Amino acid sequence: LGEPDGSISERAKMIAGHIEAGGMPTPVIEDIRRTVWAKLMGNITSGPLCILSRSHMKATLADPAIFAAAVRVAEEGAALARAYGCDVGTGAEGRMRRSATIAHKPSILQDLELGRAMEIDALLTVPLQMAKEAGVPMPTFELTAGLATLAATSAGLYAPPAG
């Protein structure tokens, strides 16, 4: 939990305290923007690839070609974050190596498996729009997001906006 201006506010501490009282650890951090960008980078790399493989990260990233694509998407995501003033650091390959050890199914894959509406716009469409607005090429992510969107549409779990 954090404030957009990077401060540790009493408000954030109070909200965190209430959440923690319910049993969920809730750290208050200074650089919430970096944390949000890091989360988005995880979503754009793992979500589409796991939708396409219909499997968790460990199985998906075991294939060298898919692993290489994930690294490229992570690098594209880092470039997008930098374009918006947030340096999430480098080390896309290291992040993907860590992800490749976890048998985690991203929530968007869980939605597909359970027949629930999928968050295509928030997790895929908006980052692509932001990339276009910032002039950041994301060809690998554009491909994986397009295929994942088609999979969601074909499953009846996403309806692209009209227009």
What label would you give each PLM region?
Residues 59, 68-163:
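NAD(P)-dependent Rossmann-like dehydrogenase/reductase catalytic/cofactor-binding core
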Residues 1-88:
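Internal alpha-helical scaffold of NAD(P)-dependent oxidoreductase catalytic cores
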